[in-house]
Amino acid sequence: PVRRVLDVPRAVPEIVVALVLIFLLGGGPVPAMIAIALHTVGALGKLFSEVNENASLKPVEGLESVGAGWGQRMWFGVIPQVAPNYLSYALLRFEINIRASAILGFVGAGGIGYDLRNTMSWGQGKFDEAAAIFLLLFLTIVAVDQISSKFRHRLTDGQASAKVML
């Protein structure tokens, strides 16, 4: 039932939610943040539920056979299996949200996309500002992608400590 509820915010694109919220709340960053947050909750809910379904129950059963409580079974049997995927998906959504925020800003939701739209007024000669904004956006996305990629590799190679994974 929860999974079906999370399908609703995931099914509606951020841009549609943002445009409705801009109409209701006015322009600015708040409608964009709400739109991105709703879509992210839906997407991560689906991804996390699939990770949970694919987790092996054998460690949990083994821990139960030696008298471990529910918390111990989850902490030692489930979390080590799902934490790397949770973190990987969260980092992926962070990258997606950066891109989405630029697009939503372009349609009037504030932020760097809004600045980009304002500088792209043809005929005012602000091409250097527009190019600088494009470059900053590109470099930000590449930097976040590289950092999250390295972090994901650390997790999947087993080099990350338990403190980092949690």
PLM segments and residue spans:
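Generic hydrophobic transmembrane alpha-helix motif, especially the helices
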Residues: 2-37
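Alpha-helical membrane-interface segments at transmembrane helix boundaries
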Residues: 2-9, 95, 117-120, 124
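Hydrophobic alpha-helical segments of membrane proteins
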Residues: 12, 16-20, 82, 86-94, ...
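Generic transmembrane alpha-helix signature in multi-pass membrane proteins
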Residues: 16-21, 50, 61, 91, ...
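Glycine-rich helix-loop "coupling/hinge" segments at transmembrane-helix boundaries
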Residues: 23, 100-136, 156-163
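Membrane-cytosol interface at the C-terminal ends of specific transmembrane alpha-helices
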Residues: 27-78, 84-93, 146-149
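C-terminal transmembrane helix and the adjacent membrane-cytosol boundary/short C-terminal tail
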Residues: 88, 131-166
